[in-house]
Amino acid sequence: MNTFGREFRITTFGESHGKAVGVVIDGVPAGLPLSEEDIKRELERRMFCHIHWLNPRCEPEEFEILSGVKNGHTQGTPIAIVIWNKRAISSYYDELWMKPRPGHADLAYYLKYGKFYDHRGGGRASGRTTAAIVAAGAVAKKLLSQLGVDVCGHIIELGGIEVRRSYTFEEVKSSWAKPLPVVDDEALAAMLETLRKNAAEGDSVGGGVEIWAVGVPPGLGEPHFGKIKAELAMAAFSIPAVVALDWGAGRALAKMRGSEANDPIIIKSGRPALESNKIGGVLGGITVGEPIYFRVWFKPTPSVRKPQRTVDLAKMEPAVLEFKGRYDVSVVPKALVALEAMTAITLADHALRAGLVRRDRPLRDPVV
């Protein structure tokens, strides 16, 4: 499926080396302030062109809003956004046809679609397609801002270098003023060096990010199927290269006794609250009004400039690949922005399901 969501619903399209990637967004109520600058800002956060190793293709992210927005406000009709592919070089992939790259989706796509799949730049499986997700996420973030919800993430590990100190949500947000969104300057310097080193060696690295959603109202999610954690996990694993997810205090909770893991319930600002929020803002699959936080881990970019063993599917014999095209030394920074977007899309969908935002009336007619 290329469609995600029930009430706030996105359908993405396009391949890495096609004319464009894009998204159609259904479910946005009329009257939401939305400008091209809102979309542009999120797409630019994903670029990282100032670090050449992270985005050698460096698409200019020229886009058009084709429908659903007039005079700076949504119309309550489908919003279509197209992002043009300007800097694809398909000749890099000529010698890779029918020779699936280890670690990429090439083999899976061949087994599912036969010779009809587009292998150039990874085709539909490319990280390039997440630009469309980020554009949709910009709309979701704007909708969530009407409810006071703020979604932001940061890098916690890259190439084996970890952030080990504690931090606040404000530090997470301000880290975006740095070359990479990393709260710890010492870790940031080491991460930049490992990126440089692996680029020089023709290799790649993976890593981890943490997502925060603050101001999330209680009551989002369902008691069984449709749990908010389950749907956020599905959203996360929709992004290429994701390999693991850790919620709240995560694996540390599994090592505790129940008396340690349980969060005391207290009164804060006149309402029930959790004392430490080790569970990441969700109990029984439903939000409780505390910040949501979780970590997601990404594998290294499969494209590397080192010999890799594969098979020639046309001849059904062993082959060796040595990729000569452009590649990102790590998917982590760009994927972080896509993960923020999928988080916002999921929360917007649940806000609509819960009736916190109504689709059948303009936003200027408040329901909360």
UniProtKB/Swiss-Prot annotation:
Keyword Lyase among UniProt keywords: yes
Pathways involved: Metabolic intermediate biosynthesis; chorismate biosynthesis; chorismate from D-erythrose 4-phosphate and phosphoenolpyruvate: step 7/7
Family: Belongs to the chorismate synthase family.
Binding site for NADP(+): 46
PROSITE patterns: CHORISMATE_SYNTHASE_1, CHORISMATE_SYNTHASE_2
Note on how the cofactor is bound: Reduced FMN (FMNH(2)).
Gene Ontology terms: cellular component: cytosol
Organism superkingdom: Archaea
EC class: lyase
Keyword set includes Flavoprotein: yes
Residues engaged in binding FMN: 124-126, 284, 299-303, 326
Enzyme Commission number(s) from the entry: 4.2.3.5
Catalytic activity: 5-O-(1-carboxyvinyl)-3-phosphoshikimate = chorismate + phosphate
UniProt cross-references to SUPFAM superfamilies, sorted A to Z: Chorismate synthase, AroC
CDD domains (alphabetical): Chorismate_synthase (cd07304)
Listed cofactors: FMNH2
Functional note: This reaction introduces a second double bond into the aromatic ring system.
Protein's name in the database: Chorismate synthase
A GO molecular function held by the record: FMN binding
Keywords for the protein's UniProt record, in alphabetical order: Amino-acid biosynthesis, Aromatic amino acid biosynthesis, FAD, Flavoprotein, FMN, Lyase, NADP
